[in-house]
């Protein structure tokens, strides 16, 4: 099989298929027993899946009509969609209890296959199933049906558009032409589960093929279609697991959240009248739980410190460094049946087991971590559960390695356990939740940390306790944040040491703080991809930019909406390189569907503009089939082109978040909360700046009152170079000059005279007099009211003299008027003046100054924004504008830095500092320290020269985090100097 057919190693771990029956009886002695055989498999889709799907398709209808209640209560026809779904599920569960018994676990394993952690991954994907079906049905792979199965990602040669992008539906089309049976089969749910257990244990095609062949012989096409959806764990039945759990038992969702065990939900909660005992609401050894999460950053440190709930007796809170790794829980129990006497299991935040990667015992040959934990626990420790972060550690640099290298490092450690230089996994533990049979989640964090320090013996750079600092004020947080900036760390986490551990909850007891970088909105946003746009030029033929959405919360959802519905939010086309595009294609292949404007997928995606369908994508994808990407942006702006009425300005791709699915992507309400926090923070910063300015204001002596434009007795010094540029011209100068150079009225008159011109004190004293003014004085207003005289700004006089000086030796040339030279223009003059500059206001006749270039006209800004928007629609940014709006510093290679460069290096507008990839940690820390010592100032990105080169090659600005310099222990820095 190729990479498109079989799951990656991490998704197909070598773990047991399930517990033996005797072990199950011992573990669950009071589990319910069914009194009769399970229902036939076809009952699942005939009485559950199909009815739920029909509810999803039908319009909701008028509220008043649906709310009519007859004399015998409310009929199913009068229920709203959510109530009708519950009604269908309730009837199925009621029938199961009556005809089968109280053990609904066999059915739930097929209804919610993605929640079944007891059955291993099958290790096969769509292409492998297609190949086996071609063999089973003896179809020519080059035939129409063979092509449709093996190339299901492409539009079928004759398949219905309804099945395009739906592999199970494509299989139904093909199987329907050559079924082994047309009526439903006789396989029971229990029998299907047994066969699926065998299929999950099979690792080769010759083992999988006979199992799939038996399903083909005993099922009709519709049964096989649903079976394939179960194998792929892509059910799409029109109801979420929350609805099923809620109907089954009021404590079901809670128990699943703390155990991630579908089996426990079904067996321990089989009686809806018996609620969970208090002791059963906590965590259990060797059962995965959903961990506590840190709350999002708030608008001010003062508020965050207040949320730590300090008291007079105990005002302390803790500061921890935020690690850039994968959240991991470790379970350990004494077990004499395992070599070494200890059994281990590892789970990620999303309940994915990684025991196969890190080890199940001290002598596990595949254990990239556990082989080092022989002496990692204190005497007397029999069992524990630890919460921490698994990161990649680079022993050569003695520093964390970049995000995304963890699994590679773990696999490398498995293959070469004696390497002392290769990257390795390091578990940083920050909490203990269970010790020697006692649940510690109800104890305070301070007490849990004491227990952790007594129970664990750290193993250097393999298994360590994550340090913390005690603090009482926001100043200490700011100091820690400056240290984070200097060390290029992820951020901080503030923790309340008086708080219990809150399972499956994002609470203010833990709050994350991140440094704010130049040119960025603040928080990285994890957005779900819901649409794609084909590119042009080098990007042509593929989806090169993506429509991202915000998950709709219950509070924003319309009645009857899909649980996975999203609002359109922004288009992202910048920051992707070739590998990023390939990775997204790999995870979404075959799941894209062409957007049909006549039948838009409003159950999943809601665009702006209603029927106009603003920013309509070329292709769309269901949120549950899609990927989550991390996006950075310059700011948030209003836009009627996106459903929320807001969008991101200049969004840029950072990385793919494979640790998240659509359910954990950013929701509408979460984004609005983040936006509110950022805006409040900016307001407070502006207020602080204003207050500090007021403190520094100095009193100045009052100037004597003068009449503007009238100062005849002023002593005029030399006003500038002399020449003949104004020979034969008459001037009436009304005011002084304020820009680009300040000159008094007499100084301007002297400048005119020195260059061959004559000046007068009225506009009627000589013919064709040029009137000059920079402010609307009484005389200037009078001339303007007459409307028959052009009034020129003094800047034209200054520009003429300056250009004549630049062109010394050439014939004198009088500059034509430009729009910037006109204080007032008579009718018809505007077009003449406008023709003397380009679309950006750049003169055709004179040299543009650096001051004018730095003061970018609004037209250029708008053009840049249009070009940036075109990037997000699949076009390329012109190379010359790739680094527009950035201020990049290239430090000098010499140790002796000039005073001017030292001043430049601390300039507040610097966004990036480019250094040599081999620079030492000493030099890098010194660079970061320059900005970390400046409170309130945004931090520039420190990157290697590879960022410039790779961005240039990719024709887009790539994420800076990928190009951060490695941190070394010693040595002399080698700053990069171009050329």
UniProtKB/Swiss-Prot annotation:
Catalytic site: 322 (n6-amp-lysine intermediate)
Record-given protein name: DNA ligase 4
Keyword Repeat: yes
Main localization (coarse): nucleus
One of the protein's GO biological processes: double-strand break repair via classical nonhomologous end joining
NCBIfam families: dnl1 (TIGR00574)
Encoding gene (name): lig4
Record's keyword terms, sorted: ATP-binding, DNA damage, DNA recombination, DNA repair, Ligase, Magnesium, Metal-binding, Nucleotide-binding, Nucleus, Repeat
CDD domains assigned to the protein according to its UniProt record, in alphabetical order: Adenylation_DNA_ligase_IV, BRCT_DNA_ligase_IV_rpt1, OBF_DNA_ligase_IV
Single GO cellular component term: nucleolus
Entry GO MF terms: ATP binding; DNA binding; DNA ligase (ATP) activity; metal ion binding
Chain residues that bind Mg(2+) 2: 490
Domain BRCT span(s) in chain numbering: 721-814, 867-965
Enzyme class: ligase
Subcellular localization(s) per the UniProt record: Nucleus
Function: DNA ligase involved in DNA non-homologous end joining (NHEJ); required for double-strand break (DSB) repair.
CC cofactor: Mg(2+)
Organism: Aspergillus fumigatus (strain ATCC MYA-4609 / CBS 101355 / FGSC A1100 / Af293)
Region called Disordered, residue ranges: 1-39
Annotated binding of Mg(2+) 1, by residue: 389
């Amino acid at each position: 099989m190729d990479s498109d057919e079989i799951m990656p190693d991490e998704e197909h771990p070598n773990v047991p298929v399930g517990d033996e029956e005797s072990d199950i009886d011992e573990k669950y002695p009071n589990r319910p027993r069914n009194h009769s055989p399970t229902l036939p498999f076809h009952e699942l889709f005939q009485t559950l899946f199909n009815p739920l799907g029909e509810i999803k398709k039908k319009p909701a209808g008028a509220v008043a009509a649906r709310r009519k209640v007859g004399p015998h209560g409310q009929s199913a026809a009068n229920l709203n969609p959510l109530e009708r779904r519950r009604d269908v599920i309730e009837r199925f569960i009621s029938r199961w209890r009556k005809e089968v018994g109280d053990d609904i676990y066999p059915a739930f394993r097929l209804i919610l296959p993605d929640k079944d952690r007891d059955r291993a991954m099958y290790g096969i994907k769509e292409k492998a199933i297609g190949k086996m079906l071609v063999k089973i049905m003896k179809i020519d792979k080059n035939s129409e049906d063979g092509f449709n199965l093996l190339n299901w990602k492409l539009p079928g040669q004759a398949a219905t558009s309804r099945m395009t992008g739906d592999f199970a539906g494509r299989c139904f089309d093909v199987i329907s032409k050559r079924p082994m049976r047309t009526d439903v089969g006789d396989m029971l749910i229990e029998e299907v589960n047994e066969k699926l257990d065998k299929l999950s244990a099979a690792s080769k095609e010759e083992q999988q093929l006979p199992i799939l062949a038996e399903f083909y012989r005993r099922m009709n096409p519709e049964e096989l279609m649903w079976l394939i959806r179960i194998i792929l764990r892509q059910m799409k039945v029109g109801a979420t697991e929350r609805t099923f759990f809620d109907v089954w038992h009021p404590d079901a969702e809670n128990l699943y959240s703390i155990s991630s065990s579908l089996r426990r939900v079904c067996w321990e909660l089989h009686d809806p009248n018996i609620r969970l005992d208090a002791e059963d609401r906590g965590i259990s050894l060797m059962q995965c739980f959903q961990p506590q999460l840190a709350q999002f950053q708030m608008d001010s440190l003062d508020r965050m410190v207040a949320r730590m709930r300090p008291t007079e007796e105990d005002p302390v809170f803790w500061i921890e460094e935020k690690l850039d790794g994968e959240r991991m829980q470790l379970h350990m129990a004494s077990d004499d049946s395992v070599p070494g006497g200890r059994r281990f299991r590892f789970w990620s935040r999303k309940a994915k087991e990684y025991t196969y990667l890190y080890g199940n015992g001290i002598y596990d040959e595949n254990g990239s971590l556990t082989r080092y934990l022989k002496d990692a626990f204190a005497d007397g420790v029999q069992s524990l559960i630890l919460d921490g972060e698994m990161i990649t550690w680079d022993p050569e640099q003695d520093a964390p390695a970049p995000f995304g290298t963890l699994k590679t490092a773990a696999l490398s450690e498995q293959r070469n356990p004696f390497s002392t230089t290769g990257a390795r996994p390091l578990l940083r533990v920050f909490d203990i939740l269970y010790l020697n049979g006692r649940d510690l989640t109800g104890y305070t964090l301070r007490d849990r940390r004491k227990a952790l320090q007594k129970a664990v013996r750290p193993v250097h750079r393999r298994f360590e306790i994550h340090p913390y600092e005690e603090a009482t004020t926001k100043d200490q947080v700011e100091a820690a944040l400056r240290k984070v900036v200097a060390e290029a760390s992820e951020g901080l986490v503030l923790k309340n040491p008086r708080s219990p551990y809150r399972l499956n909850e994002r609470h203010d007891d833990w709050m994350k703080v991140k440094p704010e970088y130049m040119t960025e909105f603040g928080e990285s946003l994890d957005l779900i991809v819901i649409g794609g746009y084909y590119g042009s030029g080098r990007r042509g033929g593929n989806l090169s930019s993506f429509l991202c959405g915000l998950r709709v919360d219950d509070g924003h959802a319309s009645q009857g909406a899909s649980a996975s519905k999203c609002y359109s939010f922004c288009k992202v086309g910048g920051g992707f390189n070739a590998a990023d595009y390939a990775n997204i294609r790999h995870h979404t292949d075959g799941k894209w569907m062409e957007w049909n404007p006549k039948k838009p997928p409003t159950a999943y995606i809601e665009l702006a503009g209603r029927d106009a369908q603003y920013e309509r994508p070329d292709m769309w994808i269901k949120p549950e089939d899609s990927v989550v990407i991390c996006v950075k942006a310059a700011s948030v702006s209003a836009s009627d082109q996106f459903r929320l009425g807001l969008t991101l300005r200049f969004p840029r791709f950072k990385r793919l978040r494979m640790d998240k699915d659509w359910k954990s992507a950013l929701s509408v309400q979460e984004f609005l909360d983040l936006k509110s926090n950022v805006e409040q923070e900016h307001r407070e910063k502006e207020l602080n700046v204003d207050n500090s300015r007021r403190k520094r204001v100095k009193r100045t002596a009052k100037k004597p009152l003068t009449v503007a434009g009238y100062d005849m007795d002023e002593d005029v010094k030399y006003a500038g170079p002399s020449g003949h540029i104004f020979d034969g011209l008459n001037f009436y100068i009304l005011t002084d000059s304020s820009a680009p150079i300040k000159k008094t009225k007499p100084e301007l008159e002297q400048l005119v005279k020195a260059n061959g011109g004559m000046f007068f004190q009225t506009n009627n004293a000589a013919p064709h007099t040029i009137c000059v003014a920079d402010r609307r004085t009484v005389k200037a207003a009078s001339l303007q009211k007459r409307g028959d005289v052009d009034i020129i700004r003094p800047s034209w006089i200054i520009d003429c003299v300056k250009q004549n000086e630049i062109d010394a030796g050439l014939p004198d040339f009088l500059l034509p008027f430009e729009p910037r030279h006109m204080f007032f223009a008579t009718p018809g003059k505007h077009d003449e003046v406008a023709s003397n500059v380009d679309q950006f206001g750049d003169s055709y006749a004179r040299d543009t100054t650096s001051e004018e270039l730095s003061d970018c006209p609004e037209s250029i800004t708008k053009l840049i924004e249009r070009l940036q928007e075109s990037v997000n629609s699949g076009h390329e940014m012109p190379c010359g504008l790739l680094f527009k709006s950035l201020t990049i510093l290239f430090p000098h290679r010499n140790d002796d830095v000039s005073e001017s460069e030292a001043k430049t290096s601390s300039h507040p507008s610097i966004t990036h500092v480019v250094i040599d990839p081999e620079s030492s940690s000493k030099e890098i820390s010194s660079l970061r320290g320059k900005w970390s010592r400046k409170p309130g100032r945004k931090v520039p990105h420190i990157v290697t020269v590879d960022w410039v080169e790779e961005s240039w090659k990719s024709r887009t600005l790539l994420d800076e985090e990928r190009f951060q310099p490695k941190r070394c222990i010693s040595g002399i820095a080698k700053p990069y100097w171009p050329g």
